[in-house]
Amino acid sequence: MKKTILILLISLTGLATATYSQTGIYDAELAQKLKADEIGMKKYVMAFLYAGDRVAEYSKEERSEIQKGHMSNISRLADMGKLILAGPFFGNDSLRGIFIFDAASLEEAENLTNTDPAIKAGVLRMELKEWYGSAAVMMVPEVHARLQKPKN
């Protein structure tokens, strides 16, 4: 499953890069803002979220509170500009979700993940990998905010 996801992400990045380079519309200001290299790419840290070993130690109510804290932490990291993309996987697999961090190192990303209540509680665990992808991924939060309906 993880291999399939990585292949898909790499393919999409390559397709986006190839399509963009064919248009010939280079925006130096945007490239600098997004910290893109000469081919429009940058390094990220990708986190794979797995079910942790301590899930069974918590009641349904406790897990619900941990999940609320997890979601609040996601919002906090996104507001800081560190968490660029996050989302769950479908199904009941042990692989629960993914984060993409704008982090300079694995250590920085690990420090960010260690602020998550679900990680602290052992309900989730993270596997971190450096990933080289399109700098355009940095625009996901801005675009997503324009697509998400306001809460009532």
Model-derived features: positions:
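Bacterial Sec-dependent N-terminal signal peptides
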Residues: M1-G24
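Conserved, structured core segments of small domains
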Residues: Q22-N152
